[in-house]
Amino acid sequence: IAGIPIDELQEIVFSQANSDEFLYNRIMTKYAPITPCHMIRLKQQVNDIGYHYSDRGGFVDYYHATDYTDALNTLLDENVPLLLEKNYRMEAFELVNCIFYEIGNRDIDDSDGGTSFVADNCYEYWQTILQECNDKEKENMFQWFQDHQENYVIDYLEDYISDFLLNEFHDEELLQKKLHMLDEKIVKFQKENYSGDSYSAYYGMVNNIITRICLMEELSYSKQEIKEYRQKYRNFSEI
C-alpha cells in the first residue's frame, strides 16, 4: 500500500466508499465535520441493518440474530468513539439512542441473548458520554431518559432506561429532580397501581420508596428527616 501513488490510493478509496455505504459513513465520521445530514445517514444505516437481517414481517430469526446484533455493535464501536473524540457528544448520544430503539423494538429470536449484549453496549456508551458532558448536556440527557421511561422499547429493556436515570446522574440539581420524579411515581402507585394483592405493583412501590430514601441519604438529609419519611411507609416490611 505504501507504494501506491497517493492520487491512485484516493481514487481506490473513493470508488470503494461510493459502493459501500457503511465504509462511506465510517470515513465521513472520522474525517469530515458531523452535519445533520451525516447523522441522518448513520441512522439510516441502523434501519438498513434491521431490514437486511429480518424477513418480510420484520422478524430476525435464529440463524440471522447473531449477525444482526454483531452489526449493530460494530456500528456503535466504529462510530461512537470517533464522535466523542471530535467532541460531538450529543450526536453520539443520538446514535446510541437510535440503536437502542432498533434493538428494543425488533422482533427477534433472542435465544443467544444478543439483544442484551447490544443493550449493555448502549448502556456503557451512555455512561461514557455522560462522563464527558457539560452541565447543559447532562440536563438534556436527564430529560431524554425521563421522557422515555415508558412505551419506548419492549418492557424489559425499559429497565435499562430507568436504571440509568436513577443510578447515573449525581449532580445535586439532577438528584433533586430525581427525588421529585420518584415522589410523582409513588403518588401514582398509591392512586392507581398499588394493590396488596399485586406482587409487581407492591414491589414497584417498595423499590421506589427505597430508592427515594437512598437519594435522601446522597443529598445529606438528616437522620431525623429520613426517619420521618420511613415512618410514612411503615406498613411495608421492607422499609
Listing of model-derived features with the role each one plays in the protein:
Residues I1-I239:
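Eukaryote-biased, non-catalytic alpha-solenoid scaffold regions
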